[in-house]
């Protein structure tokens, strides 16, 4: 049996230690019904070829119009549509060397210390997996898929009020699911969004009492009757609302032979009567700083910038919606040189963030811990660094968004990578597979998002 820091390692016992470490966020998602445990899928996966991809039937709802029951009108019949949903197992593995563990593992709490770190690591990975899936399904294309994306997205970044307010959440879930909006139970948001709501006194926090009898915040609140999980791993995108403007002022005009480096190119000032072919800039007929600034602006090009002249300044204006640093600009005097320059930021960039808040409802994801053949094991490398003990961990889990199939249209291995999950080409609304596809009603899908500036 393998040893870890001279301790006997029992993988089965260690697994029990890991499993009993509470994952508060996942527990809340389970309690709220967002993650619907489907242990039956594990058996189905074993029955289908490959064991990593499964297609299951999904029954449609009864529909159609009734006829008049008057004793003379024939009763028409219709059948419910049967859709099929495809799901994929996400496999991940990670190993650590003994010294990688930050906690002291030499004492009696060895199992607790290591198991707590391993449990926290995998809880974060599961959260990342969910976010990657959500990113992917909101990147779907095609008419039916885009109807879901558009209706289930509330983007207020260009509205009169760009931050989440008292009515934003309620309006967003109504836009997504109409009169089915009561299905939503949880909103997961960045702390910046939550702080804005706290300042408006719209959040009420849940609390728990620890073993020492101390009451603490769970980091979970409620808003409009929905649970609010605060997590800074939610997506946020940097947006440049004002691009920067930089300048180089020629405070003392250059003489022939002086040099100026702009970007990666060094330019030499030459007499006004000389050729300025190549990396050369004329000093100008009068040799003034203003003439030289104009000549520089006419000569120099730098990707991402528009270069102009204003009096004795060379102005570098960044392209819209970008935030590059100022190009490198320096000057070197020749033997009888005179040039002196001063660089400045005339207009600093204004950068804001677009925050994504996900709103999830009852049964938003089917969830199954499919298990790995060997989830935990130890190995010893006796040679490296005089001997190292290594803990290997593996997991296989299924997170399937309700009403949306993983198509594996762009996947190169049995387990999808993070990029595969984020790729909209790998997702589509559940449908009947016919040539002229009939899709599930998007209002049945309890998944929505709000994009805001806070």
Q: What are these model-predicted stretches?
A:
Residues 52-59, 64-65, 80-88, 137-176, ...:
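Surface-exposed, low-hydrophobicity beta-strand/loop segments enriched in small/polar/acidic residues
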Residues 222-239, 349-427, 431:
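Internal mixed-charge
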Residues 1-87, 182, 229, 371, ...:
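N-terminal "assembly arms/tails" that initiate or stabilize quaternary assembly
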Residues 241-343, 347-349:
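Extended, beta-strand-rich, solvent-exposed assembly scaffolds of outer structural proteins
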């Amino acid at each position: 049996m393998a040893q870890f820091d001279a301790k006997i390692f029992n993988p089965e016992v260690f697994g029990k230690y890991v499993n009993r470490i509470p994952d508060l966020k996942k527990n809340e998602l389970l309690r709220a019904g967002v993650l619907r445990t489907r242990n039956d899928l594990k058996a189905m996966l074993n029955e289908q070829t490959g064991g990593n991809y499964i297609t299951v039937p999904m029954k449609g709802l009864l529909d159609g119009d009734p006829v008049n029951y008057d004793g003379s009108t024939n009763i028409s019949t219709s059948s419910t549509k049967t859709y099929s949903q495809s799901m994929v197992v996400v496999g991940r593995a990670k190993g650590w060397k003994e010294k990688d563990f930050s906690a002291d593992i030499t004492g009696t709490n060895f199992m607790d210390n290591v198991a707590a770190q391993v449990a926290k690591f995998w809880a974060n990975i599961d959260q990342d997996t969910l976010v990657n899936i959500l990113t992917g399904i909101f990147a779907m294309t095609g008419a039916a898929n885009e109807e879901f994306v558009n209706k289930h997205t509330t983007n207020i970044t260009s509205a009169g009020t760009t931050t989440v307010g008292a009515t934003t959440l309620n309006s967003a879930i109504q836009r997504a699911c109409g009169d089915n909006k009561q299905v939503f139970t949880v909103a997961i948001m960045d702390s910046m969004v939550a702080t804005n709501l706290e300042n408006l006194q719209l959040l009420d926090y849940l609390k728990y009492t620890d073993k020492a009898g101390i009451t603490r915040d769970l980091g979970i609140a409620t808003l409009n009757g929905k649970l609010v999980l605060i997590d800074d791993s939610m997506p946020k995108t940097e947006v440049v609302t004002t691009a920067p403007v930089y300048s180089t002022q020629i405070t003392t005009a250059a003489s022939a032979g002086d040099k100026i480096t702009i970007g990666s190119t060094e330019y030499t000032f030459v007499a006004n009567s000389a050729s300025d072919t190549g990396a050369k800039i004329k000093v100008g007929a009068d040799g003034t700083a203003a003439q030289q600034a104009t000549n520089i602006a006419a000569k120099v090009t730098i990707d991402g910038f528009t270069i102009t002249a204003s009096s004795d300044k060379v102005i570098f204006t960044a392209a819209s919606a970008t935030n590059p640093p100022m190009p490198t600009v320096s000057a070197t005097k020749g033997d009888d040189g005179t040039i002196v320059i001063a660089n400045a930021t005339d207009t600093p960039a204004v950068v804001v963030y677009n925050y994504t808040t996900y709103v999830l409802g009852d049964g938003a994801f089917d969830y199954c811990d499919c298990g790995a053949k060997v989830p935990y094991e130890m190995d010893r490398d006796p040679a490296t660094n005089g001997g190292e003990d290594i803990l290997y961990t593996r997991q296989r889990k299924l997170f399937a968004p309700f009403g949306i199939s993983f198509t594996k249209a762009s996947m190169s291995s049995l387990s999808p990578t993070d990029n595969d999950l984020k790729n909209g080409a790998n997702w589509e609304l559940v449908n009947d597979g016919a040539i002229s596809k009939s899709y599930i009603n998007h209002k049945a899908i309890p998944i929505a998002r709000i994009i805001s500036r806070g």
